[in-house]
C-alpha cells in the first residue's frame, strides 16, 4: 500500500485545494492530509479564517481524503514520522525547498519521495486570490 501525505493550511477550501488533493491521491492508495495548526499558519504569515479544528473537519469530509490529522506545532518531522509516507506531495505554491526537505527526511531515516503538484488552471486557485476577490467585491458594494 502506497501512502501519500499532503500538507497545507486549507483555509477557504477552493478548486486549487481539490486539484492538489485529487492529484495527490492518484499517486497512491491512501491519502493522509496534514492540516496546519493555527499557530503554524500564523508563523508563516497566514491568519486563518477557520480555526484548526474546523479546517480539519472540512478536509476530512473531502472525497480524495482517507485520513486528516493536525500537524505538530513545533516540529513538522514528528508528523512525518507518525505518518511514514511513501510520497510527500507539495502544492505548487508551498514554500518548501525540496532539497532541504529531502535532507531532513534522510536525517530521520525516512525515505519518502517528494512530488510537487502542478498549479490548477482555473480562476481563484489560491486562498490569497479568493481573499483578494472577496475584498474587491466588498469594495464595489461600499
From Swiss-Prot:
The record's function comment reads: Catalyzes the transfer of the AMP portion of ATP to flavin mononucleotide (FMN) to produce flavin adenine dinucleotide (FAD) coenzyme.
Task: Please name the GO terms of the biological process aspect recorded for this protein, alphabetically.
Answer: FAD biosynthetic process; FMN metabolic process
- Among its keywords, does the record have Transmembrane helix? no
What are the entry keywords?
ATP-binding, FAD, Flavoprotein, FMN, Nucleotide-binding, Nucleotidyltransferase, Transferase
- So what EC number does this one have? 2.7.7.2
| EC category name | transferase
User: Record's HAMAP family?
Assistant: FAD_synth_arch
Instruction: Fill in the subunit field for this protein.
Output: Homodimer.
Q: Which NCBIfam families match?
A: cyt_tran_rel (TIGR00125)
Q: Under which name does UniProt file this protein?
A: FAD synthase
Q: Which SUPFAM superfamilies match?
A: Nucleotidylyl transferase
Cofactor(s) for this protein?
Answer: a divalent metal cation
Q: Does Repeat show up as a keyword for this record? A: no
Pathway terms, separated by semicolons: Cofactor biosynthesis; FAD biosynthesis; FAD from FMN: step 1/1
In its UniProt record, a GO molecular function of this protein is: ATP binding
What catalytic activity does the UniProt entry give for this protein? FMN + ATP + H(+) = FAD + diphosphate
Instruction: Identify the residues that bind ATP.
Output: 9-10, 14-17, 93, 120
Pfam families cross-referenced by the UniProt entry:
CTP_transf_like
Q: Which family does it belong to?
A: Belongs to the archaeal FAD synthase family.
Amino acid at each position: 500500500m502506497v501512502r501519500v501525505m499532503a500538507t497545507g493550511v486549507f483555509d477557504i477550501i477552493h478548486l486549487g485545494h481539490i486539484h492538489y488533493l485529487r492529484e495527490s491521491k492518484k499517486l497512491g492508495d491512501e491519502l493522509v492530509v496534514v492540516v496546519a495548526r493555527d499557530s503554524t499558519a500564523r508563523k508563516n504569515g497566514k491568519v486563518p479564517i477557520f480555526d484548526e479544528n474546523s479546517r480539519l473537519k472540512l478536509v476530512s469530509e473531502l472525497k480524495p481524503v482517507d485520513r486528516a490529522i493536525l500537524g505538530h506545532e513545533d516540529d513538522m518531522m514528528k508528523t512525518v514520522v507518525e505518518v511514514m509516507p511513501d510520497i510527500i506531495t507539495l502544492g505548487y505554491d508551498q514554500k518548501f525547498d525540496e532539497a532541504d526537505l529531502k535532507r531532513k527526511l534522510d536525517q530521520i531515516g525516512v525515505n519518502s519521495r517528494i512530488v510537487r503538484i502542478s498549479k490548477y488552471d482555473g480562476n481563484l486557485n489560491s486562498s490569497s486570490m479568493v481573499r483578494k476577490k472577496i475584498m474587491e467585491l466588498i469594495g464595489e458594494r461600499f
